[in-house]
């Protein structure tokens, strides 16, 4: 700890954003990274905690106090090494992680927490700028082969870890580009795809092979039988995510103009990449309604505003959370409180405790929603009598989360055992971690745990890689 009084001398300084009126004209990132002096001061705010709760609050267990102190002292290259020791892709988490570490920061008990995420962002950006982020190809090859199905954060983390210890790794991706959720689920204004592309290039030098347009299981023209992978590879990691969206089973669901968020968002990313997207779903000049109050819903809001929507309204079934948390009750855990994203700041009407009763159409196209107020008591929901109302809508986007992995194809072909929620069953404790019910098949990320954060997917990919390495070699030196 380099500055014992840093948390007293320096106030928390958040990263700045480009003004909304200008950033709405493009799809680039708009966050302004801290400069060296600002990052040093923010690192100085890190206290000499007896127990660094930030470390346990972070799913990948980043050694946060160490790299905060190193940034304060100006030792950026060593800070990057410490950061990379626990996280393969701080370029992603430094941009899109909600930072549960900051909720767990000891300062957060009675003041503003350390700006951990902004410091992480500054470290990795400086690392690339200075040329410190280099491939780490293995010195010796093991002769073992691993297939990774899915190129999202869990699959990429597992593939990189295994390649670095000498295994031959092939990543299979059903889409036309590598990246999974990072590529097509997260808007470019939150994560420009150049960050993803340079990581993929790094991994290719390390020996990872990527095969796109290849779906494992199923009957499409690009599909490959799951049994073929079992025959050709020594181990198989399933990291295909939880792609089955939660639907809205109400009258009018089949009207034109009603779409899942993951039909809407990927199209814009494809357009940004230079692709031609026939019949793109556009919000231009439309009254947009987003159903679902989470991050994906927020991404729909930001994208709709960039399209030039006439209006954007977001509905959430749950009641409005409090503006601030009771820290004496919630710390060091992630608190339930009102969160306003940059997309909300760009223009959006938000309403809570609202349920959709019916989608109303005209000539086969959605024109309105019939809504009702709901009350919550002891975890149960009831409608408020006489509260029904209709609001106009030309485009309805369903962003209510994801319920499970897709069963058809890969999971059915392998006849994998599922847990009670419909995810691939695989424990993270004891012997046989991440192993499924089928020999030499492992699962990690959202496909195993259900919908979650990118940082959790990275954690699971890293841990799964260690278990696969131990399975192949008898033991593993990879970190847990």
Name each model-derived stretch:
Residues 140-141, 145-149, 197-250, 357-375, ...:
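Feature captures the FAD/FMN-dependent oxidoreductase FAD-binding
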Residues 123-140, 198-213, 245-307, 419-435:
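Glycine-rich dinucleotide-binding loop and its adjacent helix/turn
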Residues 80-87, 100, 119, 182-234, ...:
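N-terminal Rossmann-like dinucleotide/flavin-binding domain of flavoprotein oxidoreductases
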Residues 167-183, 312-322:
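Glycine-rich FAD pyrophosphate-binding loop
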Residues 145-170, 296-306:
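N-terminal Rossmann-like FAD-binding beta1-loop-alpha1 element of flavoenzymes
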Residues 23-41, 63-95, 99, 110-140, ...:
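Ferredoxin-type iron-sulfur electron-transfer modules in oxidoreductases and energy-metabolism complexes
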Residues 297-302, 307, 438, 447-478:
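A conserved FAD-binding loop/helix module that cradles the flavin
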Residues 254-285, 377-451:
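FAD-site-proximal beta/loop scaffold in flavoenzymes
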């Amino acid at each position: 700890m380099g500055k014992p009084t840093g948390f007293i001398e320096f106030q928390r300084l958040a990263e700045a954003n480009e003004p909304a009126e200008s950033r709405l004209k493009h799809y680039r990132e708009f966050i302004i990274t801290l400069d060296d002096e600002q990052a040093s001061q923010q690192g100085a705010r890190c206290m000499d905690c007896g127990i660094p709760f930030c470390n346990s609050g972070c799913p990948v267990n980043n050694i946060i106090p160490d790299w905060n102190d190193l940034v304060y002292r100006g030792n950026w290259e060593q800070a990057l090494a410490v950061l990379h020791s626990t996280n393969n892709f701080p370029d992603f988490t430094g941009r899109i992680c909600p930072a549960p570490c900051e909720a767990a920061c000891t300062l957060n008990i009675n003041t503003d927490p350390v700006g951990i995420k902004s410091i992480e962002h500054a470290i990795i950006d400086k690392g690339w700028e200075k040329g410190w982020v280099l491939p780490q190809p293995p010195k010796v090859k093991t002769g073992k082969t691993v297939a990774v199905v899915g190129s999202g954060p869990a699959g990429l983390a597992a593939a990189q870890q295994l390649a670095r210890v000498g295994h031959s790794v092939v990543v299979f991706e059903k889409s036309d580009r590598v990246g999974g959720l990072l590529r097509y689920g997260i808007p470019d204004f939150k994560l420009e795809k150049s960050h993803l592309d340079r990581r993929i290039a790094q991994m290719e030098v390390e020996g990872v092979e990527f095969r796109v347009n290849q779906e494992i299981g199923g009957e499409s023209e690009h599909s490959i039988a799951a049994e073929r992978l079992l025959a050709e590879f020594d181990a198989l990691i399933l990291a295909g995510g939880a792609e089955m969206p939660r639907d809205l089973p109400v009258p009018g669901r089949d009207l034109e103009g009603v779409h899942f968020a993951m039909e809407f968002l990927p199209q814009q990313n494809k357009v940004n990449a230079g692709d031609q997207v026939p019949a793109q779903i556009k919000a231009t000049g439309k009254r947009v309604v987003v159903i679902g109050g989470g991050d994906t819903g927020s991404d729909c809001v930001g994208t709709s505003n960039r399209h030039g929507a006439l209006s954007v309204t977001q509905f959430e079934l749950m009641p409005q959370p409090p503006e601030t948390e009771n820290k004496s009750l919630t710390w060091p855990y992630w608190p339930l409180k009102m969160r306003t994203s940059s997309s909300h700041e760009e223009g959006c009407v938000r309403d809570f405790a609202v349920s959709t009763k019916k989608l109303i159409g005209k000539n086969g196209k959605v024109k309105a929603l019939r809504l009702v107020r709901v009350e919550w008591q002891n975890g149960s929901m009831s409608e408020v009598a006489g509260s029904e109302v209709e609001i106009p809508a030309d485009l309805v986007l369903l962003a209510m989360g994801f319920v499970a992995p897709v069963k058809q194809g890969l999971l059915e072909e392998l006849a994998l055992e599922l847990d009670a929620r419909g995810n691939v069953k695989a424990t993270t404790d004891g012997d046989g971690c991440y192993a499924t019910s089928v020999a030499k098949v492992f699962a990690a990320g959202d496909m195993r745990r259900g919908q979650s954060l990118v940082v959790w997917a990275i954690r699971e990919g890293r841990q799964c890689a260690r278990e696969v390495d131990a399975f192949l070699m008898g033991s593993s030196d990879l970190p847990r």
